[in-house]
Amino acid sequence: MGALPASSHALITAPLRGEDEIRDNAAFEAILWALSRPGDVRNLPKPGPRTILLALIDRECRVHADDPVIAGLAAQTGATLAPLHEACHVFLQLDPGADTARLATLKTGSALYPDEGATVVTEARLGEGQRLRLSGPGIETTREIAVTGLPQGFFALRNDLCRYPLGFDLFIADGSKVMGLPRSTRIEVL
């Protein structure tokens, strides 16, 4: 088969990116950077877990969401809605009085497949409240952060469940801000 005539090259153009694709790519970049630099706060193009969902979820994902609106949006992507203990992507509504016992059923992977640990997304206030000291990959020495709006004992339970390489990755959304805490991050409650 011969080469295309030189004049036909001008007919081939790249598709234009739509507003949704631009938003989802910007959100993906923000959450990627947030997870690679634990404790850093990144800006999302639009507020809330909805933006994170649209950047991460597709039809190959198993999703659990406490909020029916988020669950409906996940279903629209073609993702499979799953119970908490089977979901790879978990969108939780955790208010300060919530019972954390159910979090013990989150997928944390196995020695053979640690990558099967869940990705958890929740909302809380960043920059105020309970002080935490972070250490581990992506942090030069240590880093102190503050988070409020999560149940008492949440980070203690998270530490029990996250024994690297096992565990779950956590995104905390606060309006249009997001912070990532990967399973490899050690969290000391101050």
Question: Where do the PLM segments sit?
Answer:
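N-terminal, charge-rich interaction modules
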Residues: M1-R62, D66-V69, A75, S176, ...
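Internal, well-folded beta-alpha domain core
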Residues: E60-C61, D67-L190
